[in-house]
């Protein structure tokens, strides 16, 4: 009887271990499955993203963003852009062909970039102080806004303040630069749900300064997070589903790690007005 009881306990222990192992595997597998992306080049993906964004952003802002996406994808969508969400792997876009198609339709209007699209989405959710801006590095943005008639005078002023160049020190210490960005953004009031994730770049061509080199919008979903971005003026929109904020931080940190040079600090991430310490 004792022997039978011992065998039963052993079998129960093995079964428990198997169940734990399966649960861990399922959790890992589920997390891996969550990282998926789309270039919004299908009606289904566009409607899904519109629905998610509309839960956290002003309807007019979302509509304007969707119109920009449609214009871009209607123009260059034939160049291998993805429609429905698919597993997220390294993306590679034919910029030369995209540029050719875009220019044929839009002439000298270069389109929109990450900053223009982020402001389009978040303009009703960020309280922007009326302070002096440094627009030295926004020359392409300003040209696009002017030629595309994208913003009125007030929106352009707020856009330039949000993405102003920020003075810093001649150091490679990211903590020093992050403090300067945090001090600048203390003047702003950001939204807790629709978050602005920025990749901040150190530049010293005309004195040491900090600049939002890339930016996108992160919003919560029922199970995870959605990050939307326009990669560059030429490169497409990406909507990426992440399991966690940290996964999105890692994506941005890895993708833009080489946006630096001799004597410069490495790029760093800001979540709204706070530095994300990845070390």
Task: Describe the residue ranges of each PLM region.
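Cysteine-nucleophile amide-bond enzymes
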Residues: 8-10, 16-279
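Positively charged n-region of N-terminal signal peptides that target proteins for export
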Residues: 1-7
């Amino acid at each position: 009887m004792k022997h039978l009881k011992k065998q039963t306990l052993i079998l129960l222990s093995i079964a428990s271990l198997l169940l734990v192992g399966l649960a861990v595997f399922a959790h890992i597998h589920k997390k891996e499955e969550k990282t998926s992306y789309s270039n919004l080049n299908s009606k289904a993906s566009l409607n899904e993203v519109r629905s998610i964004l509309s839960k956290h952003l002003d309807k007019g802002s979302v509509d304007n963003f969707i119109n920009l996406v449609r214009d871009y994808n209607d123009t260059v969508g034939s160049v291998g852009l993805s429609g429905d969400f698919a597993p997220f792997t390294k993306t590679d876009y034919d910029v030369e062909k995209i540029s050719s198609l875009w220019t044929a339709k839009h002439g000298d209007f270069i389109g929109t970039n990450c900053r223009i699209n982020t402001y389009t989405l978040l303009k009703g959710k960020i309280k922007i102080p009326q302070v002096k801006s440094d627009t030295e590095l926004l020359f392409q943005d300003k040209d696009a806004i002017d030629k595309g008639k994208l913003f009125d005078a007030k929106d352009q002023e707020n856009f330039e303040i949000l993405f102003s160049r920020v003075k810093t020190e001649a150091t490679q210490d990211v903590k020093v630069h992050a403090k300067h960005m945090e001090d600048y953004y203390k003047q702003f009031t950001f939204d807790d749900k629709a978050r602005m994730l920025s990749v901040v770049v150190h530049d010293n061509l005309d004195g040491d300064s900090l600049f939002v080199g890339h930016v996108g919008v992160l919003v919560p979903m029922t199970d995870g997070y959605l990050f939307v971005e326009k990669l560059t003026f030429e490169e497409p929109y990406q909507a990426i589903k992440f399991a966690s904020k940290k996964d999105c931080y890692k994506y941005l940190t890895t993708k833009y790690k080489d946006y630096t040079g001799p004597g410069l600090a490495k790029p760093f991430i800001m979540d709204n007005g706070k530095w994300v310490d990845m070390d």
